[in-house]
A protein has these predicted regions:
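Eukaryotic compositionally biased, intrinsically disordered low-complexity regulatory regions enriched
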Residues: 65-88
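Eukaryotic low-complexity, mixed-charge intrinsically disordered interaction/regulatory segments enriched
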Residues: 9-56, 60-72
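Long, charge-rich, low-complexity intrinsically disordered regions
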Residues: 1-14, 88
Length: 88
């Protein structure tokens, strides 16, 4: 039998599905945070989120919750406010 690298872990199919879902949710949350920190939501960013939500199987409810989280995050709001001056 050939050696596989990296080594495959002893994870069940259910564990793999659970881990994958967690990665998808974290990735979407990270993109939402980054886009919020960049400032205004442009049409291109909205389109990107639409595509990502499809690819990562993000429900409308989850999308709305992530947007609420990001909009109410003081750190992200501060970064967005201050980054407006980076490009002046």
């Amino acid at each position: 039998m050939p050696v596989v690298w990296p080594t495959l872990l002893d994870l069940s199919r259910d564990e793999c599905k659970r881990i994958l879902r967690k990665l998808e949710l974290e990735a979407y949350a990270g993109v939402i945070s980054a886009l919020r920190a960049q400032g205004d939501l442009t049409k291109e960013k909205k389109d990107l989120l639409g595509e990502l939500s499809k690819v990562l199987s993000i429900s409308t409810e989850r999308h709305r919750a992530e947007v609420r989280r990001a909009v109410n995050d003081e750190r992200l709001t501060t970064i967005a406010h201050n980054s407006a001056f980076f490009f002046v």
